[in-house]
Amino acid sequence: METRYSAADIEAKWQQQWLELGLDKTPSQSDKPKFYALSMFPYPSGKLHMGHVRNYVITDVIARYKRMQGYRVLHPMGWDAFGLPAENAAIDRGIPPAKWTYQNIAQMREQLKQLGLSIDWDREVATCSPDYYKWTQWLFLQFYKAGLAYQKEAAVNWDPIDQTVLANEQVDAEGRSWRSGAIVEKKLLRQWFLKITDYAEELLQDLNTLDGWPERVKLMQENWIGKSTGAHLEFPVVGSDEKVAVFTTRLDTVFGVTYVVLAPEHPLVAQVTTPAQKAAVDAFIAEVSQESEQDRTADDKPKKGVATGGMVTNPFTGEEVPILIANYVLYEYGTGAVMGVPAHDSRDCKFAKENNLPIKMVIIPEGGDATAVLTEAYTEAGIMVNSGQFDGLVSTEGKKAIAKFAAENGFGREQIQYRLRDWLISRQRYWGCPIPMIYCDDCGVVPVPDSDLPVVLPEDVEFSARGGSPLAQMADWQAVDCPCCGKAARRETDTMDTFIDSSWYFLRYTDANNTEKPFALDPVNDWMAVDQYVGGIEHAILHLLYSRFFTKVVRDRQLVSVDEPFKRLLTQGMVQALTYKNPRTNKYVPADQVDPNDPKDPETGEPLTGFYEKMSKSKYNGVDPALVLDKYGADTARMFILFKAPPEKDLEWDDADVEGQFRFLNRIWNLVAGYEAAETSVKATGELSKAEKDLRRAVHTAIKEIQEDLEGDYQFNTAIAELMKLNNAIKDVKCVDSPVYKEAIETLILLLAPFAPHIADELWSNLGHSESIHTVPFPQLDETALTVDEITIVIQILGKTRGTIQVPAGISKADLEKTATASDIAQRYIAGKEIKKVIVVPNKLVNFVIPK
């Protein structure tokens, strides 16, 4: 055995041996229990970053541990390979998107292999491959056949930089595109949608079945689905047969309606606007069209409106109230209209005051004054007043009575509404999955026949600087015969939102090489659901909600039997690094140009502010994984990533701690090297000495603690701390010829194997084993080894610790008091003194109370 640990010498060797042995191949169906371990697959940017490393190492430890436990494990990897960066690279660098993407995949695949990940590369998928997106298109057609994919003209979120449409979820709280950062505009386009709203209630209710998900993620999805229970009401337009429909959760306040507001985009606006108000209304609509959805609805933004001149009748009171349009009402949400109750809604109250609209109080607190002048909205429940026949009812009773009254009179009904909107999937870009639809002048919209799939992206494409999709300019590619009538027709030129690709990839992994189907029933039902999914919290709504939706739809198409795709979800924290910024200029300064002991701006000499932030190029604080692997090896990088912080917490990069993990692996190496060099013959098993019992107890304590850490919340940091304790316990004993010592050494290496797989296999081999350590079962806990012959008892005098004694385990309370009283430590303080009281805490302490 080499006396010095060299990661460079052993890691490539073992990676090659694992490949030759096929250790990472997914076993076929058997009597063994299955475990599906999955990391969210990456976008192939071409370079691994530390966030990737953390994600994939966490999943790999789980996969390796489960294999050692006797599970057959599916641990695949692939590439979320469609998307704008490849298209922008074609524009900026003149490289075709496919070439750029596949080059990046090749680079990142090798980087991942260097980490020693136990991935079954035979199941690798790339969403940009026609072999994959053929089935993405096929699944889209399943949605279409089920009535879940449809077209409509809609005011959509338009990214003016990337020249494409965004889903609501892809616009941040400031109204900016999630990718380009541009202020999003509204634009009317005919688009494809998926009817996720058909599954809103099931998506909401099934969150209750996801016991293995973080509560935070479930709450985010619950809020996004946004279920509201209320009523649908119709206000007749004066002088017209039209009605303004509204949804309200405060039916008890309907007698306080003093105006109705339409969204500027509402189709009734043109009909209800009077000639006198047309100019003002048109100007207001033009002004609002320049505002983002977020600006229009944010609490801290002004709520602006203008009167249309039209009126509606409150069906409960017969009173006519004005119709206004306002920026804070969105046509895409609810009915696109709201009733204004300024006495009992803070936003309505502010809007009414600014527009000189009346305020009518109809709810008062119990014991309140119905004639009092309101200075601000009363928004709580209470007693109904000024509400005709419903006066005196409490809000809850009033809601029910009014709902019944409205239903009986034909102008309202109880209703459930969701904040969730249908999923807009059309994108005006090239590098995405083509939507498999055809437009025929005679037959209308026609699906591409299954036999003609995939609709393949053309390769001879010219790109202009972010000027929309080149597919729309390619007449030859668009030209196609109609599958129904055979006449000349044209292809759809939009491609799908890339979140479609990632909404089913976990299903494809179960049968990745099937050329006849996206996946067959036997393998998909064998492996699904994913037992452990690992990825970032940033995907809580988008990817995770869409994946749940897709799974439910394919279940209803009898393609899979599970209701939910992911049993357990671990959302790992970010990897942060020390970041420097000049507080005067607000500019980031590269960390490698700063002395951490005296941080100064290298250009100006000004003092810098140092703090931890997520690693990123723009902050000049990234750490290249390749440099860490070159210097220390993959095992050290893995150990640091796992030890530095619990997986769900943010991790702060620290070079000194990386060095610390390298030293720890060296200590284990030296321990095994010393044992091997001693060439000690192991003596026969006999009665164990105290030292042997103590060592065996340390071994099985480590097994117990590490197993609990890997079964529960994946506290890898405390598991590695147990490895350190065990290493120290072995180092401190001298019985190297004992079978217990050999058991301890081998157990230490077995426990290390999921965390640092290369060094573990090397040390296992050096101990004379011919098989890979990754084929050996996880150590079995022997509960009897945890029992102790003696325990330590603290002796206290007047509550102050004076020393400890050893007593037999299981000693009675009375015998413990006698033994403690007779001990030299106690006698030193109590001899010849009155003992007022003796407090005995079994297995812990004895406290003597004597006169001061």
Curated annotation (Swiss-Prot):
Entry's EC annotation: 6.1.1.4
GO molecular function: aminoacyl-tRNA deacylase activity; ATP binding; leucine-tRNA ligase activity
Motif annotated as 'HIGH' region, chain positions: 42-52
Motif ('KMSKS' region): 614-618
Pfam families in UniProt: Anticodon_1, tRNA-synt_1, tRNA-synt_1_2, tRNA-synt_1g
Cellular localisation: Cytoplasm
Disordered: annotated segments: 586-606
Swiss-Prot/TrEMBL keywords: Aminoacyl-tRNA synthetase, ATP-binding, Cytoplasm, Ligase, Nucleotide-binding, Protein biosynthesis
Binding site for ATP: K617
Keyword presence, Transferase: no
Main location as per UniProt: cytoplasm
Enzyme's top EC category: ligase
Annotated TM spans: none
Origin superkingdom: Bacteria
Catalytic activity line of the entry: tRNA(Leu) + L-leucine + ATP = L-leucyl-tRNA(Leu) + AMP + diphosphate
GO biological process per UniProt: leucyl-tRNA aminoacylation
GO cellular component terms listed in the entry, alphabetical order: cytosol
Keyword Ribosomal protein: no
InterPro entries from the UniProt entry: aa-tRNA-synth_I_CS (IPR001412), aa-tRNA-synth_Ia (IPR002300), Leu-tRNA-ligase (IPR002302), Leu_tRNA-synth_edit (IPR025709), M/V/L/I-tRNA-synth_anticd-bd (IPR013155), Methionyl/Leucyl_tRNA_Synth (IPR015413), Rossmann-like_a/b/a_fold (IPR014729), tRNAsynth_Ia_anticodon-bd (IPR009080)
Gene3D superfamilies membership: HUPs, Isoleucyl-tRNA Synthetase, Domain 1
Family per similarity comment: Belongs to the class-I aminoacyl-tRNA synthetase family.
HAMAP family assigned: Leu_tRNA_synth_B (MF_00049_B)
PANTHER family: LEUCINE--TRNA LIGASE, MITOCHONDRIAL, LEUCYL-TRNA SYNTHETASE
Listed name of the protein: Leucine--tRNA ligase
Chain's gene name: leuS
